[in-house]
Regions:
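An acidic intrinsically disordered interaction segment
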Residues: 7-25, 147-164
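Compact structured core domains
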Residues: 125-172
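Long compositionally biased, domain-poor regions of proteins
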Residues: 1-3, 15-105, 110-129, 163-285
């Protein structure tokens, strides 16, 4: 499958401003997971994060639009595959208090899945980081991030429409080269985001070739709740695949130009989908 070229977005601002915005965005997302062993275990894979997202979206669509309430059967029907894994994941969400089960008053066999405050607050913070970066890159006017926090109707409208983001992630799977390579691995998306953050911190201005930065595999593994051997293996394979260039003598790496282009293409597409949903939510309320 051919890689996706970057959208014609966010290219009018300076290189330095773009570097700063992306570094701050990556840092904010990484900080949400840094040292949070339980969160990383629960949401370590894309399927798990998306299943939780689908659950919350369906709950808000029921609350706002009168759509069908989320149940395990509904999530499994929409997932199409991996239904046993999905059932185990929902059980973990219930066990950790992120989701509660509510019996249907007319049919006690039916259990509705109700996202709890911890899960909703985490989603709100996660969306806010994306809208902040959209504003910094010029994809959205200022004020959307603040409105997400302060305006309940806007948050509800955004979440109701956020399923389109998940749909696009699925339809674009495998289209972003090196980013897709990382994202398919356990914790790989967060590892790639941390590498992107450190790249832009080391390269606030354009350099050719780009400057290398320290490779702290043990610290990275500990912070993201991954095994040292898993992270070492992932980074070794990434170097062999041409996503990273390694200076073993100085224990440093740099992103290859191809990997940087592919990852920035993914990020700009991803953020543009958030911007579209934000525009639609604003029009709705």
């Amino acid at each position: 499958m051919d890689s996706m070229p970057p959208p014609e977005l966010a290219l009018v601002i300076s290189h330095e401003a773009r570097c700063k915005a992306v570094a701050l965005y990556c840092d904010a997302i990484v900080r949400m997971h840094w040292g949070e062993r339980l969160i990383n275990k629960i949401f370590g894979r894309v399927m798990q994060s998306h299943a939780a997202g689908r659950l919350v979206v369906q709950h808000y669509r029921w609350k706002v639009e009168g759509a069908e309430r989320p149940t395990l059967a509904l999530l499994q029907r929409n997932a199409g595959r991996g239904t046993r894994t999905l059932a185990s994941f929902v059980a973990v969400l219930r066990l950790t208090g992120m989701v509660a089960a509510e019996a249907d008053p007319h049919d006690r066999r039916v259990r509705y899945l109700v996202p709890q405050e911890r899960l909703i607050d985490g989603l709100r913070a996660w969306i806010a980081h994306h809208l902040r970066c959209c504003e910094a890159l010029g994809l959205l006017d200022a004020g959307h991030e603040a409105r997400l926090t302060d305006d309940v109707a806007f948050f509800d409208a955004f979440v109701c429409r956020a399923g389109s983001i998940l749909d696009r992630v699925v339809s674009h799977r495998g289209r972003f080269g090196g980013w897709s390579w990382f994202d398919e691995r356990d914790g790989g998306g967060r590892v790639a985001m941390l590498l992107l953050r450190d790249h832009f911190k080391a390269n606030p201005k354009a350099h050719s070739p780009s400057l290398a930065f320290p490779l702290r595999a043990h610290e990275l593994a500990d912070g993201l709740g991954l095994s040292h051997s898993h992270v070492r293996g992932m980074l070794k394979e990434a170097i062999e695949a041409g996503h990273l260039a390694h200076d073993a003598g100085r224990a440093q790496v740099r992103l290859t130009p191809r990997f940087l282009d592919e990852t920035m293409s993914w990020l700009l597409h991803f953020l543009s989908w958030f911007a579209e949903v934000a525009h639609a939510a604003r029009r709705a309320c």
